Amino acid sequence: MRIVAGRFKGRRLHAPSGSKMRPTLDRVRESIFNVILHGLKNWEGSLNHASVIDVFAGTGSFGLETLSRGAAHATFIDNSPASLAITKKNAEHLGIWRNITLLKLDATQLSPPPLAAKAPCSLAFLDAPYNMKLTQPALANLERQGWLANNALVVVEIAAKENLSFSSNFSALEERTYGPTKVVFLNYDT
């Protein structure tokens, strides 16, 4: 696993061995960023100086990729101490630990964001364990608790056969399938 582009392009990321984590594949992450940067007609945001939230962070690859590409800050949420430890190790390895906030939280039961999270965020990524029914409650909590900025882009990774429902404040911009993975791009507009 590596950073795909930006100032840390090609740098390897640590991943726990023997873990049940399912990190987003490099090629899928690269495709996601190609869509974000070149394929969304109705999103007017930017990665430059963005505040990002990576929910169900795992290794932190998505948030770290955004920092490599110009984001100002990334908040990583996971309920696993091992996931947060590997994310911290990766951020330290890249020399960007000052640009991150690590929060050990259950994403389905979020409270309002702490000041360190630099919320509301203009870009969010949710990659819950597949088929566990965690994505929709986490998405609803991000909205309800004020984690998302108006016009935020929310990228949701789910199993290809899963369906995603969301409130009327979200609109689907794009949907892509990569083998067993479906990626849904949503715009949040209050």
Regions found by a protein language model. Give the residues of each.
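Class I S-adenosyl-L-methionine-dependent methyltransferase catalytic core
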Residues: 1-190
